[in-house]
């Protein structure tokens, strides 16, 4: 992975992820091949915070059809990043 911005693709904004922000847990969509160490280094480099823990999950592709053509959606990887207690809050919502 060349760049921290190549690893962290975008924040995941759902009702559950917004509620977890009060506990200093932030959810990001990340590159499927990125390891937890690479994700930790990328978050610390981009936002300037300390990461305590990272949980990752890979969502399965779903079968989709467009007319007679069948295919699958892309595989996605999400990372739930827990910050240390003394870290500042991330303000990527604006």
Curated annotation (Swiss-Prot):
Q: Name one GO biological process term.
A: translation
Q: Which UniProt keywords apply?
A: Ribonucleoprotein, Ribosomal protein, RNA-binding, rRNA-binding
Highest rank taxon of the organism: Bacteria
Q: Which InterPro entries match?
A: Nucleotide-bd_a/b_plait_sf (IPR012677), Ribosomal_uL23-like (IPR013025), Ribosomal_uL23/eL15/eS24_sf (IPR012678)
Q: Which GO terms describe its cellular component?
A: ribonucleoprotein complex; ribosome
An MF annotation (GO) of this entry: structural constituent of ribosome
Outline what the protein does: One of the early assembly proteins it binds 23S rRNA. One of the proteins that surrounds the polypeptide exit tunnel on the outside of the ribosome. Forms the main docking site for trigger factor binding to the ribosome.
Sequence similarity: Belongs to the universal ribosomal protein uL23 family.
Q: How does it assemble?
A: Part of the 50S ribosomal subunit. Contacts protein L29, and trigger factor when it is bound to the ribosome.
Q: What is this protein's record name?
A: Large ribosomal subunit protein uL23
Species per Swiss-Prot/TrEMBL record:
Exiguobacterium sibiricum (strain DSM 17290 / CCUG 55495 / CIP 109462 / JCM 13490 / 255-15)
The record's gene field reads rplW
């Amino acid at each position: 992975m060349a760049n921290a911005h190549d690893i962290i693709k975008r924040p995941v904004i759902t009702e559950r992820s917004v509620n977890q922000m009060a506990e200093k847990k932030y959810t990001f969509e990340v590159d499927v091949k990125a390891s937890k160490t690479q994700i930790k280094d990328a978050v610390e480099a981009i936002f300037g915070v300390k990461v305590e823990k990272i949980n990752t999950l890979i969502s399965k592709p779903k079968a989709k059809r467009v007319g007679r053509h069948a295919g699958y959606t892309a595989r996605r990887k999400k990372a739930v990043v827990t910050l240390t207690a003394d870290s500042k809050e991330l303000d990527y919502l604006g």
